[in-house]
Amino acid sequence: MIKDDVVTGRVVRVSGPIVYAEGLSACSVYDVVDVGEASLIGEIIRLDESKAVVQVYEDDTGMRVGEKVTSLRRPLSVRLGPGLIGTIYDGIQRPLERLFQEDGAFLRPGARSQPLDGSVRWDFRPHCNERGEALCAGIPIAPGSVLGTVQETPSVVHTIMVPPDIRGSVLSSFKGAGAYTIDEEIGRTDLGEPLFLSQYWPVRRARPFSKKLAVCEPLVTGQRAIDVFFPLSKGGTAAIPGGFGTGKTMTQHAVAKWCDADIIVYIGCGERGNEMTDVLSEFPKLIDPRTGRSLMERTILIANTSNMPVSAREVSLYSGITLAEYYRDMGMHVAIMADSTSRWAEALRELSGRMEEMPAEEGFPAYLPTRLAEFYERAGRVETCVAREGSVSIIGAVSPLGGDFSEPVTQHTKRFIRCFWALDRELAHARHYPAIGWIDSYSEYAQEVSAWWSKYDPRAGALRAAALDLLRKEQRLQQIVRLVGPDALPGEDRLVLMVCEMIKGGFLQQNAFDPTDVFSCPEKQVQILRTIVDFHERAVVLLRAGISLSALSQLSCRELIVRMKTTYGNEDVHKMQKVYDTMCTEFDQLSVCAAARTQGGEKVE
C-alpha cells in the first residue's frame, strides 16, 4: 500500500536477521524500511514479484508474522557534518555513548538517536576567495563547492561543502558568519534547495571526484618494518592477515595511533568488545606528535562487536568508508582501519545461508569478491570536484582460520590490495613485534614512494633491497643450520646470520611500550638501516682480507648499533652519526691491522 510516498507491507516469514515481506513491490532495492512494532531498521536487499527480502540491522527476537513493514523510499544513508570526530557509532551510525546514557549498556531494539548533536551551535565562517571577499548571495556554486568552515576540534578544521547531489548552480541566499546548529538553514540555491552545515549520503554509493591521481607519498606509520620494507602509500590498500594471537589488532592500533593521516576511521567489525574499549581508554591519553593534541580529536570509531547483530557488520564497512570519503573531499588524508574483514565476510556467509543462496568456496557467497572489490576500490588518492587533493587509505585485517592464507577471504583480498603484511606466528610467539614476516609480505608501492625516501638518503632504495636480500638469504641458510649447525658454514654466510640478527633486533623489532622506540621518524629509520647495511659491506671486505669472524663479532659498535633505536629519540637523530663514526673508526683500525698482518702472512683473530 502506497500512502504519502510511504509503502506499507507485512511480514510473512522470519529467518533470523532476514525477514520476508509482501506488499513492497513498489519499492526499490536498498530502500530503508521500519520493520515490526519496534520499528527496527532494515534494508531491502532483494525483490521479486510478490515478496521483498529485508535485512534487519537490529535484534529481531520475538518478531511475528503479520507485523507491519514500512518503506521510507530512500537508501540507507549516514549524516555528514561537524561533530563526527571523537564519536563512537554502531554500523548504522547510531551514537553508542548517547544510547548508553538513555538505555544503559545493552541496545534496546528500535532505539533511535540522532548521529550528530543538534543542540550544538557551531561558529561558521564563510569561505573567502583569492581577493579576500566572503561568499555571498549570487555567487555560482557547484557540487563540492566550499561554503565555509567550522572548528570541529582544536586540531581539525571542518569544511562545509555543497552536497554532490544538490540541484541549482547559484547561491540565491546566504546567511553569512554566525553560530548555527546542523539543522539551521544557512543558504539556498536558485532552485530552492536548502543548504545546511550537514548533509546525507548513501553508504553504498561512492562519493564523486574529478579524477584519481597516482600515489607517490607513503603513509608514515613510525613502524620501521612497514615504512621501509613494506610501505603503504597515501591512498593505498593493505591487508594484515594472521592467525589468532599474532598481533593484527595491536598492529592496527599502532598504525592508527602514529600514522600521519589527518583523520582516522577505526571500524571494529565483529571483533571483541574489549578491543574497542582499549581504543577508547588509550587514544584520549595519547598525544598526536604533529598537533600536540589528543588522538581522539582526529578519530571516528565504528563498533560492531561480536555480540551485536550480525547483519549490521555487513553495512559497517560501507558506513566507515563513506565517512572517510567525506573528509577526503575536504582535502584531507584519511586512514581506515577495518578489523576484521573476515568477520564481515562471515556475516555475508550467514546472511547468504539464511536466504538459501548457492554457496561457493567454504560456504562463502559467490559474490564475496565483488563485495570486497566494492570496499577496497573506494580507496585512492584523488582530485576532488573543486580541485582539492585528498586520499583514503584502507588497512584491513584478515583472520584466516588456523592462519591458513589459502582460504577464500585472504586470497580474494590479495586481488584488490597492493600491500600485504603477513603476520608470522613464530615471530609473534618469540615476542617479536610487529610480527610482520619478511618472506611472505610484499608491497607494490615501494618503487612509487622511493623518490620520497631519497630526500632522506639517496641510497634508501638500495639499502632496503640489500637488507631484504640479506634476510631472504638468512632464511635459506637457517635450513642448513638446522641440519649441520652454523660452524659448518663459510665465514661470509655466518656473517650474514650475524648481521641479520642485528637487522631483526636493532631495526625490525619495536617496543610498543618504550616511548623512544614506539615511533620512529623517517630520518631515524634510514640512519639505522644505513648503519647496519654499511656494517655488513665493510665486514665482508675485512673478512676477505683475513679478519676472522670472531674479531668482527667482538666490535663494540655492534651493541651500539642494536641499541640505537632506544638510545636516540626522534629529536636526537643527528647524534646517531656518532655511532656510525665509531663503527667506521673500528673498521679502519681493523683494516690497518689486517694490512699489517697480511704482510706477515698472519690471520687476525
From Swiss-Prot:
EC number(s) stated in the UniProt entry for this protein: 7.1.2.2
Gene3D superfamilies associated with the record: 2.40.30.20, 2.40.50.100, Bovine Mitochondrial F1-atpase, Atp Synthase Beta Chain, Chain D, domain 3, P-loop containing nucleotide triphosphate hydrolases
SUPFAM superfamilies: C-terminal domain of alpha and beta subunits of F1 ATP synthase, N-terminal domain of alpha and beta subunits of F1 ATP synthase, P-loop containing nucleoside triphosphate hydrolases
HAMAP family: ATP_synth_A_arch
CDD domains: ATP-synt_V_A-type_alpha_C, ATP-synt_V_A-type_alpha_N, V_A-ATPase_A
GO molecular function: ATP binding; proton-transporting ATP synthase activity, rotational mechanism; proton-transporting ATPase activity, rotational mechanism
Enzyme class: translocase
Keywords linked to the UniProt accession: ATP synthesis, ATP-binding, Hydrogen ion transport, Ion transport, Nucleotide-binding, Translocase, Transport
Listed Pfam families: ATP-synt_ab, ATP-synt_ab_N, ATP-synt_ab_Xtn, ATP-synt_VA_C
Binding site for ATP: 242-249
Function, as annotated: Produces ATP from ADP in the presence of a proton gradient across the membrane. The V-type alpha chain is a catalytic subunit.
Family indicated by similarity: Belongs to the ATPase alpha/beta chains family.
InterPro entries: ATP-synt_VA_C, ATP-synth_a_Xtn, ATP_synth_asu-like_sf, ATPase_F1/V1/A1_a/bsu_N, ATPase_F1/V1/A1_a/bsu_N_sf, ATPase_F1/V1/A1_a/bsu_nucl-bd, ATPase_F1/V1_b/a_C, P-loop_NTPase
Record-given protein name: V-type ATP synthase alpha chain 2
PANTHER family associated with the record: H(+)-TRANSPORTING TWO-SECTOR ATPASE (PTHR43607:SF1), V-TYPE PROTON ATPASE CATALYTIC SUBUNIT A (PTHR43607)
GO CC annotation terms, alphabetical: proton-transporting ATP synthase complex
GO BP, sorted A to Z: proton motive force-driven plasma membrane ATP synthesis
Reaction(s) catalysed (UniProt annotation): ATP + H2O + 4 H(+)(in) = ADP + phosphate + 5 H(+)(out)
